[in-house]
């Protein structure tokens, strides 16, 4: 078995479209993150609402249930969960290009990048213009002014070079990181011998 790994987005396959391209075999495997699935699978997107779990203990109790839900839902899309990558409790901040944003009033004057439908709805109720932009498009969206600010875990900000396109950050809240699912096309998975699965 040979596995060739590609960086997210490098094949032109968008995170938010994974339920559409993975079953077709456009790539045999890919990371599935429920937060990006609000358009195609609203139930999966709503399994773990941002801010609903605030401690490591609560998070660890929820993970087995999340795995079961994911396996059941992904089966309907022709995707097999080959593995899960758990994330720790993270601390989201609002990273902004041109000025610090420390109040809701100031945030209402900005265009904000978020990663899930529930976040769009929450910020909309607060009078903030928010839109889902995938992680692989976030840097360019900030650089070109598509958005002024982005919600992102501070721990991982350097991995996507946010320091190059933003000069300010304000802490927002703790987030329980949804596990990534290493999903495989069911057709591709079933074609492998059991010893390779």
Predicted regions and their residues:
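N-terminal secretory/targeting leader peptides
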Residues: 1-58, 72-197
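Short beta-strand-centered segments that line the small-molecule binding cleft or hinge
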Residues: 61
């Amino acid at each position: 078995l040979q596995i060739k790994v590609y960086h997210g987005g490098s094949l032109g396959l968008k995170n938010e479209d994974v339920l559409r391209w993975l079953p077709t075999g456009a790539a045999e495997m890919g990371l599935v993150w429920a937060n990006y699935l609000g358009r195609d699978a609203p139930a999966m997107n709503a399994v773990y609402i941002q801010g609903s779990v605030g401690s490591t203990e609560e998070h660890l109790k929820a993970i087995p249930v999340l795995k079961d839900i994911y396996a059941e839902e992904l089966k309907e899309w022709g995707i097999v969960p080959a593995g899960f990558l758990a994330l720790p409790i993270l601390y989201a901040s609002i990273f902004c290009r041109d000025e610090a944003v420390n109040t809701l009033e100031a945030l209402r004057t900005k265009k904000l990048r978020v990663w899930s439908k529930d976040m769009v709805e929450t910020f909309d109720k607060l009078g903030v213009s928010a839109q889902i932009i995938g992680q692989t498009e976030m840097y360019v969206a900030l650089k070109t002014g598509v958005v002024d600010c982005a919600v992102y875990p501070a721990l991982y900000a350097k991995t996507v070079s946010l320091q190059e396109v933003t000069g300010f950050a304000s802490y927002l809240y703790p987030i329980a990181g949804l596990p990534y699912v290493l999903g495989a096309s069911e057709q591709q998975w079933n074609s492998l011998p059991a010893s390779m699965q």
